[in-house]
């Protein structure tokens, strides 16, 4: 389904029928182009789990014996003895070395509980254990636990509020990264997206306005904010009047929220109608503070290319290509930066494919080949990949050329 909007009407194409719809004046159409990373994204080989140092049976026997010893020793010491916490922590590290992240998560949690009993709920000495729990939750594909742990770490470090230091800003950046990752590997949730946008916007504004932290962190938080905006831009569709809908005001959307009864969804719609203007304000900050940064110019050009400003994007691409030809030898799935990198371990269903295709001078794909043949979800992955827009390739003289693209990708399904 495609919806073509203007200020006065919209045409919905469905099968062979053409239905005229009255459009809410002032709306803009959500992006036609699927951000690379939503549904299909680059497969990160670093996500492969390392092999344990011993075979599974031997590891199981070692951990069973260790569990018995831990239960006995912790009972002797009691929950408040710091020595018990050290025992849990040492055992958890051993579980990690043997590849049992489920047990490691359980024992790290016990060590954290002991530390909180002894040093208090606000002690920053918890952070090293919390980091290990974040890693264990990701390895286990435990979305809820991962969200809880990064939220807890974020709260411990002040929720990204000033006064800033490197640790606080790094934790805020990682919190945003994980939250975006969780958002794109599950059913879209409008409340989460709206709250995430507000937090990213606050952080980006504060850091980019701060002369102390602007140079080192403004780019990072700008990328996170653009990442959230890309997700919202894809999922939120314009509000239209549809005579065939249950309600006079219905929304064609790419997720299942009940828009007419949810005020957060209406706020998200309002936000989405101003996405383009908000992106331009970010790019203006970059021009003012980082005028010589060609990588930022490339990100801005990519955004314009995806959002239909072809002439300006091509002009920027050609200027950048004259200085950085290596950026344009091959087509690049967008967005390249901010990269949306789904972790298949956090998805309910995922599958890895190898894709080969041609990318034309408009950045659209054709001749898509996905392997292995017969894999589950192949048709869905092909359709979703076709919706991704690419930065096209240029030849040495700065002319657009059709080019081949090949990569390992992961398909994420609900």
Where does each model-flagged region fall?
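Charge-biased low-complexity segments
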Residues: 31-43, 51-52, 56-60, 81, ...
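Non-membrane alpha-helical segments in proteins
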Residues: 51, 85-97, 111, 127-138
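N-terminal secretory signal peptides that target proteins for export/translocation
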Residues: 1-11
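Sec/Tat signal peptide C-region and signal peptidase I cleavage site
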Residues: 26-30
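Bacterial N-terminal signal peptides
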Residues: 14-24
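Tetratricopeptide repeat
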Residues: 63, 67-70, 105, 112, ...
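Repeat-mediated protein-protein interaction surfaces in helical alpha-solenoids
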Residues: 62-76, 110-114, 274-286
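Short, charge-rich amphipathic alpha-helical segments embedded
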Residues: 79-86, 114-125, 329
